[in-house]
């Protein structure tokens, strides 16, 4: 019997990150997956990052995880989302070549010391007296370990739906995990069903590209990994088109044939990634919905039409696709489908992602009720690090909400649970002004160095960056000017006699940065990346104290009673999701409202303000 410290089941994004993290920590690790080609597969959209999600990728990278490096290797278009807004809510995103990503993932796994790849089907968890002991494979061979990480994605009792047709599978061309799912039942884990979906894949040559608006990447691409500066692969454009009233008519007339609207699906789907059927029904007043046509790779014939996931029959899929501009002669190479799967209520987990009632069993990814590669990878990292620490007899890691988006997600999952697939948004974080994508390394890399998961290359690069940053920060804070001196240099500020440091001037967006840098012959020579970081820190420095006070105020006001007749529908600042859940739960206090799934700090602040205003009026 082969013996390991940690066994990871599943080679998707959570599994790869978990296995790599455990191995980096120096424990003997096995990654069990059915096929070598499964490693790093992008089952749905060919992209990494986005709003909130890009923050997670940066945090993974700061702890020497691999998703950011893989995305940089396979990225064929890079865009910084929300570029016109503040850095706190900007999100790096990359269109990825599926084949390049999968190849890079397999290569990085093969090259990791202390990590063994085992090809086979996981059939049964072995345990005795409340402790995991190992894993039995479908060929009856056994692997021994006291720490096992389940990263099964959509494969636990996975069921694909295309119209009236259903079959067992976790994704197109794959199988499902029935025997492993059966071995979980005696553990009395709180199980539920969720669903996700994917659109049909269209042959590239059947699209009329010339009739469509092209969307190129950024001229100055922003990489995910702090170790990279430029893309490795050639860059391409995507295209944009839209549905129309004819598209919507075809869908409405065939809703009964949709697996979801025909009553064949029990699982709850992701609220913020609705199927095209959902869009047509829920947003009946909209005449069109945007579709991004995303190439699946440099040499791939397939295009991913982002925005039209579906469970309609194949003939209806073809009909509505061909009603869309640019797709009039489209050929579908693979139909869209919905997939249902088992998940575990994450409230059954500790913050380490270890199951509370079975020592040594960790869960990560979609099995915990999340959706998205990035959320899965971040959980994989947490589970991998904690499984390794447990194997070493060390204390578990705790990621706090004030420290990282990873901490926000883990806390949301393990304290609030999920009733629908969980997706990360910047609005979920109380401290989002300080939890930015640009400073993830400053927040987390020292932490990673302390626990031992950061390699020498990153340690050296981070040390050099912080040496240069600290020198620039010290210089910017020590050099100051009077209003008169600034006026002579063409910079006008209030003539109040107060000296202003270069750091304070960088925070004033109305003053061109070049003018500020020209004031000092040392600062102007600094690396542009260091200056960008310095300017961003200066900008948010004035707000972070207020952010902390706001968060503390909410904590102090948790006992505030919410009137039974409180009208949530009248609050224009609340999302429809929160209005529905607040009306459903009718929380008695602000603390009870805070524990509702999907609740945000901004929503709590709004509710508190309305209650206070009402109290003042009645006084």
From Swiss-Prot:
Q: Does the keyword tRNA processing apply?
A: yes
Superkingdom of the source species: Bacteria
One Gene Ontology BP term is: tRNA methylation
The UniProt annotation places FAD binding at 10-15
Cofactor(s) required, per the database record: FAD
- GO terms under cellular component: cytosol
Q: Which UniProt keywords apply?
A: Cytoplasm, FAD, Flavoprotein, NAD, tRNA processing
Please name the InterPro entries in this protein's record.
FAD/NAD-bd_sf, GIDA_C_N, MnmG, MnmG-rel, MnmG-rel_CS, MnmG_C, MnmG_C_subdom, MnmG_C_subdom_sf
Subcellular location(s): the record lists: Cytoplasm
Q: Which residues bind NAD(+)?
A: 269-283
Name a GO molecular-function annotation. Answer: flavin adenine dinucleotide binding
For this protein, the record's Pfam families field holds: GIDA, GIDA_C_1st, SAM_GIDA_C
Give the function comment from the record.
NAD-binding protein involved in the addition of a carboxymethylaminomethyl (cmnm) group at the wobble position (U34) of certain tRNAs, forming tRNA-cmnm(5)s(2)U34.
Q: How does it assemble?
A: Homodimer. Heterotetramer of two MnmE and two MnmG subunits.
HAMAP family in alphabetical order: MnmG_GidA (MF_00129)
Q: Which family does it belong to?
A: Belongs to the MnmG family.
Q: List the NCBIfam families.
A: mnmG_gidA (TIGR00136)
Report the protein name in the record.
Answer: tRNA uridine 5-carboxymethylaminomethyl modification enzyme MnmG
* Protein source organism: Paracoccus denitrificans (strain Pd 1222)
Its gene? mnmG
């Amino acid at each position: 019997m082969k013996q390991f410290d940690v066994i990871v089941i599943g080679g998707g994004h959570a599994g790869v990150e978990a296995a790599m993290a455990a191995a980096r920590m120096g424990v003997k690790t096995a990654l069990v997956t059915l096929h070598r080609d499964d490693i790093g597969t992008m089952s749905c959209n060919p992209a990494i990052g986005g709003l909130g999600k890009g923050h997670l990728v940066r945090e993974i990278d700061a702890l020497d995880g691999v998703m950011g490096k893989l995305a940089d290797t396979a990225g064929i278009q890079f865009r910084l989302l929300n570029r016109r807004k503040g850095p706190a809510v900007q999100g790096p995103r990359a269109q990825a070549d599926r084949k390049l990503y999968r190849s890079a993932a397999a290569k990085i796994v093969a090259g990791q010391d202390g990590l063994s790849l085992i090809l086979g089907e996981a059939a049964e968890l072995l345990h005795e007296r409340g402790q995991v002991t190992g894993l039995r494979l479908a060929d009856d061979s056994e692997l021994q370990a006291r720490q096992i990480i389940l990263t099964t994605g959509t494969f636990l009792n996975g069921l694909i739906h295309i119209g009236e047709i259903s079959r067992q599978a976790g994704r197109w061309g794959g199988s499902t995990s029935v025997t492993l799912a059966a071995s979980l039942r005696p553990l009395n884990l709180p199980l539920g069903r969720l669903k996700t979906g994917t659109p049909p894949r269209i042959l590239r040559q059947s699209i009329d590209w010339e009739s469509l608006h092209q969307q190129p990447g950024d001229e100055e691409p922003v990489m995910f990994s702090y170790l990279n500066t430029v893309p490795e692969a050639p860059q391409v454009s995507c295209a944009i088109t839209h549905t129309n009233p004819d598209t919507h008519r075809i869908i409405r007339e065939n809703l009964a044939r949709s697996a979801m609207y025909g009553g064949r699906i029990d699982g709850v789907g992701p609220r913020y990634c609705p199927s095209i059927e959902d869009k047509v029904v829920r947003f009946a007043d909209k005449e069109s919905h945007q579709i991004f046509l995303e190439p699946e790779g440099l040499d791939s014939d397939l295009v991913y039409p982002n925005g039209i996931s579906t469970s309609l029959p194949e003939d209806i899929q073809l009909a509505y696709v061909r009603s869309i501009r640019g797709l009039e002669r489209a050929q579908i190479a693979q139909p869209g489908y919905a997939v249902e799967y088992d998940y575990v209520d994450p409230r059954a987990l500790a913050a380490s992602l270890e199951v509370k009632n079975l020592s040594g069993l960790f869960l990560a990814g979609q099995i915990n009720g999340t959706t998205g590669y990035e959320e899965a990878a971040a959980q994989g990292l947490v589970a991998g690090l904690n499984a390794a620490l447990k194997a070493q007899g060390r204390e578990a890691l705790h990621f706090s909400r004030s420290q990282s988006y990873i901490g926000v997600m883990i806390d949301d999952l393990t304290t609030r649970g999920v009733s629908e697939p969980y997706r990360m948004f910047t609005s979920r974080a109380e401290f989002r002004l300080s939890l930015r994508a640009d400073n993830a390394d400053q927040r987390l890399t020292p932490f990673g160095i302390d626990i031992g998961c950061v390699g020498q290359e990153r340690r050296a690069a981070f040390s050099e960056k912080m040496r240069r940053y600290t020198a620039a920060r010290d210089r910017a804070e020590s050099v100051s000017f009077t209003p008169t001196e600034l006026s002579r240099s063409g910079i006008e500020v209030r003539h109040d006699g107060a000296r202003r440091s270069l750091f304070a001037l960088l925070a004033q967006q109305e003053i061109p940065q070049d003018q500020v840098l020209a004031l000092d012959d040392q600062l102007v020579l600094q690396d542009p990346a260091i200056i960008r970081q310095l300017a961003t820190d200066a900008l948010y420095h004035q707000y972070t104290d207020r952010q902390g006070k706001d968060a503390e105020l909410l904590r102090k006001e948790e006992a505030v009673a919410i009137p039974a007749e409180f009208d949530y529908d009248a609050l224009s600042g609340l999302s429809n999701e929160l209005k529905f859940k607040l009306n459903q739960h009718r929380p008695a206090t602000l603390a009870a409202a805070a524990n509702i799934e999907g609740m945000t700090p901004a929503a709590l602040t709004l509710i508190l303000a309305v209650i206070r205003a009402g109290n003042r009026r009645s006084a």
